[in-house]
Structures are given as structure tokens and as C-alpha cells.
Amino acid sequence: MSDRSFFDTTILIYAVSAGDPRAAVAEKLLAAGGYISVQVLNEFATVARNKLKMSWEEIGEALAAVRTLCEPPTPLTVGIHDAGLAIAAQYGYHIYDSLILAAALDAECDTVYSEDMQDGQKIGELTIRNPFARL
């Protein structure tokens, strides 16, 4: 694994959060390309609709833009589900964070960018990085 980045939902959320100092960092990460999962797309749609009050059209446009920048989304499979349960049990993360980590491992990524997980922690060959830690 080398130079393969996976984005947690928070990266996508901040990329569309005008006026937030984290937006520029998130936009730069996404512009470089990387990996996401179907779960990330679904979580983005939920947060964008409920918290950001985006219309369905705006959500669709934002997700289409993300999908042009990223590799095809990793599907949520039974194998990823099982790996996510094992990660949750071993590392104590919530199941949804653990599924993100399992999807990143399945995509053979070496870095997952997330604000919500422990910066610098390694899960197998995967390293968690908080790109906003210095803001």
C-alpha cells in the first residue's frame, strides 16, 4: 500500500461548508483524489440534508463532484461488515467508524483522513490522520 487515501464523511462535509476554516483543507484533499465507500456517500447525504439543510439536488450535485474526484466507491459487503465488527471489538470504535476503517483496508489504502478517530493510530497497514489537527 502506498499513497492511497480514504476519506471519512467529515472530509466531504467540510468540503461543502463555506466559511469553515477546514473547508480549504478538505477541498485540497479531495482534489488530489482518493477512496470513499457507499457508506460515506450515504452518511454525507444524511448530514447534508439534516444538518446543512441542503436540497436533494444540491446533495446530488455534491456527491457527483466527489465521485468524479474519487475512485469508484467501495461497496458495503458482508466481508466489510464482519471486518468492521472485528475492528470495533479490538479498537473500541463505533461500528460506523469501524466500517469506514474496514472499507479503507479493503481498498488497500494506507491512510484514512478523519476528524473523528485517533490521529496517528494504526489499524493494520492503515494510519488514521486528522488533517485538521493543526488548525
Which residues fall in each region the model found?
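Active-site neighborhoods of divalent-metal-dependent phosphate/nucleic-acid chemistry enzymes
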Residues: 72-115
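Active-site-proximal, substrate-binding regions of enzyme catalytic domains
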Residues: 43-70
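Acidic active-site catalytic centers that drive phospho-/nucleotidyl reactions
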Residues: 8-10, 43, 97, 116
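Acidic, PIN/NYN-like endoribonuclease modules and their adjacent C-terminal/linker elements
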Residues: 2, 101-135
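Short, well-structured N-terminal submotif of metal-dependent ribonuclease cores
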Residues: 1-37, 51-61, 135
